UniProtKB/Swiss-Prot annotation:
Disulfide bonds: none annotated. It catalyses: 1D-myo-inositol 1,4,5-trisphosphate + 2 ATP = 1D-myo-inositol 1,3,4,5,6-pentakisphosphate + 2 ADP + 2 H(+); 1D-myo-inositol 1,3,4,6-tetrakisphosphate + ATP = 1D-myo-inositol 1,3,4,5,6-pentakisphosphate + ADP + H(+). Phosphorylated. Keywords: ATP-binding, Cell membrane, Kinase, Membrane, Nucleotide-binding, Nucleus, Transferase. It comes from Arabidopsis thaliana. This is Inositol polyphosphate multikinase alpha. It is found in: Nucleus; Cell membrane. GO terms for cellular component: nucleus; plasma membrane; pollen tube. Its main location: nucleus. SUPFAM superfamilies: SAICAR synthase-like (SSF56104).
Amino acid sequence: MQLKVPEHQVAGHIAKDGKPGPLVDDKGRFFKPLQGDSRGEIEVKFYESFSSNTEVPEHIHRYFPVYHGTQAVEGSDGAAMMVLENLLAEYTKPSVMDVKMGSRTWYPDASEEYIQKCLKKDTGTTTVSSGFRISGFEVYDHKESSFWKPERKLLRGLDVDGARLTLRKFVSSNSLSDTGSKPDSAFASSVYGGSHGILTQLLELKTWFENQTLYHFNSCSILMVYENESILKGNDDDARPQVKLVDFAHVLDGNGVIDHNFLGGLCSFINFIREILQSPDESADS
């Protein structure tokens, strides 16, 4: 089995200090290392519960990666990894964005130290003010014929206007390395709009979250991806915009209570996307 480091990872853990990072194979599978503490166990437990939960509607299952169990992987010191669907396997030049949801990223019963660590990030980003923060993104810059990805520390400093600008950049055709140019949002209607676009998918998720009380998705992310190459070739219908939920290390049982933290962030994020669709040509302030 040939494994390699993912080309387009925009957020999450990477190989560091002797600890393995995620890997992908050529069969459309993504290998995610189990975190050594309870987080790895919680994420496996969630996937096992969710994948067999008949209370979750079939059309909602498609917003989550397919789970293939766990496996010890050679070359990673035999570390156990979750085997998931590689969400980018079918994309040639994917543009990808990771958005952490909720106005609070810690979970009930977390230690005071962990709460303070999360609170520092939450208050210093758009998490508290907008109910989400952009953790990472990468787009294919066709003018430069290369992928462009900002440093994570720059994203951590985004305010509300910066988040709005970044969501425009994600669907723009002009060069993103040129900081003096305004994003043109040229791909907004192809990616965010339409009957199969990002907004439609987010609204379908919102309908479910307005009623579901099975799980609370603490510190979970929405991953958005689309095929940049198809748009550049003029085939907007093959942009294949896709929304997936990822990162479930802090998911807890819902205990019959609506997940207002995630739902509130989702509603806010939907408003940002809808605003861009309503005014795609609007010049955004830098």
